[in-house]
């Protein structure tokens, strides 16, 4: 794939009244893009909040083709923290693998996702993904991920603080979720199916294993 460069400045805040981040990247455009590019991986993205008044939260990413979920502990629900994870993944996987796995990401209009430029471009100003946004108040448009969050809530019910969570315990929880066998996957787990459908360097880099 040809690497594209573009000069840009990273922002740390975006006005909630400023909807320019959605320009040409709404749900309608998302449907048009995946219809024209049927082989792309589609990833749904969201955050899961802890107890009210606490800062830590989870960033979740869900591969539609195999139901594999990624989950990262954020210190706070901010654009800066989400960008930190994107930059970390880019460095860990390499720009070409990141582009392959995360070509298209669908998310909501949360303030932590509104700096589209910092997510779409790497620190070296290389295009790494395309971010699209659900229509306002239409979380059902990324309903597969919303449904998958129920597995998190089985262990950490709504209102539970994530302040005692660590990267290690987050990964442990995630590995158990991804190893849960699903009727929707013909009795297989997301982990098993993802080993067949996704580049296994993703599993190797992020230490994904199937708990025994």
Annotate each predicted stretch with a short phrase:
Residues 1-35:
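Basic, flexible linker segments flanking DNA-binding modules
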Residues 23-66:
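An active-site-proximal beta-strand-loop segment
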Residues 51, 71-96:
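Active-site beta-loop-alpha junctions of metal-dependent nucleic acid enzymes
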Residues 67-72, 158:
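Short small-residue beta-strand/loop micro-motif enriched in glycine and branched aliphatics
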Residues 99-115, 136-137:
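Acidic/histidine-rich, metal-coordinating catalytic segments
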Residues 121-122, 128-207:
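Charged alpha-helix within mobile-element recombinases
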Residues 208-212:
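Conserved small/polar residues in nucleotide/adenosyl-binding loops
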């Amino acid at each position: 794939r040809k690497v594209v460069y573009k000069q840009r400045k990273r922002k740390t805040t975006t006005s909630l009244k400023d909807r320019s981040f959605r320009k040409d990247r709404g749900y309608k455009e998302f449907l048009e893009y995946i219809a024209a590019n049927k082989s792309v991986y589609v990833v749904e993205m969201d955050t899961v909040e802890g107890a009210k008044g606490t800062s830590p939260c989870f960033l979740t990413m869900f591969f539609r083709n195999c139901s594999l979920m990624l989950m990262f502990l954020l210190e706070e629900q901010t654009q800066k923290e989400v960008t930190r994870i994107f930059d970390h993944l880019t460095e860990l996987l390499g720009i070409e693998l990141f582009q392959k796995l995360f070509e298209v990401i669908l998310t909501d209009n949360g303030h932590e996702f509104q700096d589209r430029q910092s997510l779409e471009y790497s620190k070296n100003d290389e295009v790494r993904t395309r971010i699209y946004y659900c229509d306002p108040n239409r979380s059902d448009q990324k309903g597969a991920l919303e449904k998958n969050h129920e597995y998190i809530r089985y262990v950490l019910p709504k209102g539970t603080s994530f302040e005692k969570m660590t990267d290690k315990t987050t990964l442990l929880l995630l590995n158990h979720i991804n190893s849960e066998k699903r009727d929707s996957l013909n009795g297989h787990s997301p982990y098993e199916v993802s080993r067949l459908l996704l580049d296994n360097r993703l599993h190797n880099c992020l230490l994904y294993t199937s708990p025994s």
